[in-house]
Amino acid sequence: WLIVDHYAIDERWHKELRPYCQKIMVIDDLADRKHDCDLLLDQTFGRNSDDYQSFVPEYCQVLCGAEYALLRPEFAEWRAYSLKRRENGQLNHLLINLGGVDKDNITTQILRELSYISLPNSCRITVVMGVTAPWVKQVEEQAEQMPWLTEVKVGVNNMAELMANSDLAVGAAGATSWERCCLG
């Protein structure tokens, strides 16, 4: 299997590689271009296979909807703990993660806006960014100006644990949405 997950790739690229692999799987959530694949996965809530009818070959199996969300096992492992934590309803720890890159520097904007709202003095904020994020320095500078303890973590490998130990998570609308849903 060749698994393709890239917005700039379409059937032209798939056809070029078809001779070198037995099967091609595409992960997509746009339903806006043709694919030459044997299996297509779209985890978008409410999406159905009819949305891809004119974009994939007849033989392609299309898996659509939240029931096909790809989650690492660690999220299932942290689920019970995370749901139990939610019972107290207090806001002591805020997690912010706008994906691995956050190319538009939304994280800094969120931190700035948070500084104008009322949060408990004991509240702490954890910001998670990817190693390729171009705005890490600006986010770190903004974090230092926050009225609450604010930590910036880069390139973490324990995202499920960080989410499970937060009371509220602010994040992008990608695959991490399903991770946040899993952990409550």
Regions found by a protein language model. Give the residues of each.
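Active-site and donor-binding regions of nucleotide-sugar-utilizing enzymes
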Residues: W1-E58, V62
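A nucleotide-sugar donor-handling region in carbohydrate enzymes
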Residues: D36-N105, V136-K137
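Short gly/ser/thr-rich secondary-structure transition/capping motifs
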Residues: C21-I27, P73-A80, T150-V154
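Donor-nucleotide binding loops and adjacent catalytic segments primarily
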Residues: A80-S82, N88-S166
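Short alpha-helical segment that forms part of, or immediately flanks, the ligand-binding pocket
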Residues: A160, S177-L183
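Anion (oxyanion) recognition and catalysis
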Residues: R18, E144, C181
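Acidic donor-binding loop of glycosyltransferase active sites
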Residues: A164-A175
